[in-house]
Amino acid sequence: TGKTHIMKLLYSACQAANPKVSFSNKVVRTMLPDDFKISRLITRIRGSNSANVKISARMDENTPTKNLSIDFNHKTKKWDAIVRGEETWEKNFKDISSIFIPAKEILSNSYNLTAAVEKDNVRFDDTYIDIINSAKVDISVGRNSVNRDNRLKAIEKIIDGTVYYDNKKDEFYLKKGNSKQEFNLVAEGIRK
């Protein structure tokens, strides 16, 4: 039914709030069509030769709705789609952050995955790389730290430990007391 495609489009729109991220490029990097051709995302039905996607959002009920849209057809090369509303989108949503959590647990396989993808040794869409990079960021300080700390404590209680990233080994561990366990040895339900 395309639920994952819709979620990836919404994720791409959230990422496009960053002025360094192109909406059309992020759509292609999260969907991974052959040869990075955005035109491959058009429904394969007779007579269908173009696509238009419009994302509408607002920060709260007191702010006006902002739109971000993308148009492309079967002749569009790579990610050269027509994008409308990108500057306004960036201006209004620059402070949001998002992460797409893939159905497959990926952190236990993160060792050198980013480097392998960058060298084209393996092929994963950006959602996997983005979640690995986000998981490596120290979130213990910064804005909303009280709210975030409360959420982290709730998660730590559920998993009976904390997730720890070893920068030298490029590996994740579940830390319980004084012991740590390799993430690939942790039960899959806890890893997710």
Where in this protein do the model-derived segments appear?
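Phosphate-coordinating catalytic segments in nucleotide- and nucleic-acid-processing enzymes
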Residues: 16-192
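Walker A/P-loop
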Residues: 4
